[in-house]
Structures are given as C-alpha cells and as structure tokens.
C-alpha cells in the first residue's frame, strides 16, 4: 500500500512516525491457542502482551461505543507525525488514494478535508494537487507541507508545536 511505502520515506527524513488504521470489520491480533486470547475470552477488558521486541495492548470494547479518532490518538506515544488510514468522516487532512483498478468513484469533493489526490489514472477537474501513486517522495512532501500549514490533529490534542525537523523537511 501507499502507507507502507510512505512510512519509511518519512522515517528516512528523520521523522518518528506512527500509523493508525481503521478496520471496518472485526479483527484479532491474537489466536485461540494463545494465553492472551484466553485472557480476553475469560473477560479481561485489556490484555497487554510484551516481549523483548515489542508489546501490544488489546482493549475489548464489549458494550462500549467505538472510540473516536481523538480518543484513539491519545493512546499513541508522542511522535513527530501520525498517518491515519480511514476515518473519512473526521476533519483531519486527507490524501485520497485512488486506484483505477478498484473501479470506485473518487471521494472528493464529497469527503471533507481532502488536500490532494494520489492516483494511477485520470482525475476529474479539481484544484486539488494530483500526485502519482508511485511518487512517494511527492506524497511525503505534500503530507509534511500540509502538517506545517494546518497543524496536525495530534499536535492540537497534545498542544505541542510542530517539531522543527518537520518544518525543515516540508520546505
């Protein structure tokens, strides 16, 4: 995906990046034969699995409402930039990723806050910047420019200024 190629490009530029992806379906990151799965099945609200290489916190919503984007962002450690996949209804800046082969219509202008379109085909008339799906450097440039121009949702939530290295990378 574009996000899988964008993340190392931003990291190469010296940024610490996190990603947040919305899943439209139920998912599991553990499996029935594992203790963590058994802990959740037994009623644990949260299960934290840790090793010397990584850790993961699994939170069961049970009867809770799905958390908002802002609530989810609060669970991330401070980083320079959070790239969000999905969450179309929220007011954060978005780059529309459009693949002709998927046969779906463009999201703009119906979806708010789209700041550019990255595609592998023709685009209806628009004033939005048009980027090629394979031009990851241009997509990274646009993301960083947008972060500097608009300030990011994470920075607003954390009331932190944009780190100088993002400002410098966006020039």
Language-model segments: residues:
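Conserved C-terminal guanine-recognition region of P-loop GTPase G domains, centered on the G4
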Residues: 89-110
């Amino acid at each position: 995906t574009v996000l899988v190629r964008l993340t190392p490009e931003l990291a190469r530029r010296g940024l610490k990046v996190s990603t947040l992806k919305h899943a439209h379906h139920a998912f599991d990151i553990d499996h029935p034969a594992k203790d963590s799965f058994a802990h959740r099945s037994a009623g644990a609200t949260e299960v934290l699995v840790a090793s010397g290489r990584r850790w993961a916190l699994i939170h069961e919503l049970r009867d809770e409402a799905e958390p908002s984007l802002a609530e989810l962002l609060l669970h991330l450690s401070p980083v320079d930039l959070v790239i969000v996949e999905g969450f179309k209804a929220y007011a954060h800046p978005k780059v529309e990723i459009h693949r002709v082969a998927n046969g779906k219509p463009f999201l703009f202008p119906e979806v708010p806050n789209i700041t550019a379109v990255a595609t592998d085909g023709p685009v209806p008339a628009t004033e939005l910047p048009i980027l090629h799906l394979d031009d990851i450097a241009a997509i990274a440039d646009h993301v960083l420019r947008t972060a500097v121009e608009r300030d990011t949702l994470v920075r607003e939530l954390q009331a932190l200024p944009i780190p100088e290295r993002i400002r410098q990378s966006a020039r």
